Curated annotation (Swiss-Prot):
Domain of life: Bacteria
Gene Ontology cellular component annotations, sorted alphabetically: cytoplasm; ribonucleoprotein complex; ribosome
Protein name: Large ribosomal subunit protein bL33A
Residue ranges that the Swiss-Prot or TrEMBL entry lists as coiled coil: none
A GO BP annotation: translation
GO function term, MF aspect, one: structural constituent of ribosome
Sequence similarity: Belongs to the bacterial ribosomal protein bL33 family.
Keyword Ribonucleoprotein on entry: yes
Keyword Ribosomal protein assigned: yes
NCBIfam families listed in its UniProt record: PRK00504.1, rpmG_bact
Keywords tagged on the record: Ribonucleoprotein, Ribosomal protein
Amino acid sequence: MRKIPLNCEACGNRNYNVPKQEGSATRLTLKKYCPKCNAHTIHKESK
């Protein structure tokens, strides 16, 4: 398992690090709270 940073779609801020399996081919997308936007936004896995 590796820690993957998640970026906010709205502002691009890196807010979370989540564990992910190494062999997974799909990119992770989660709806999480962004303190900079002060709202729940979609966060996508960064490279």
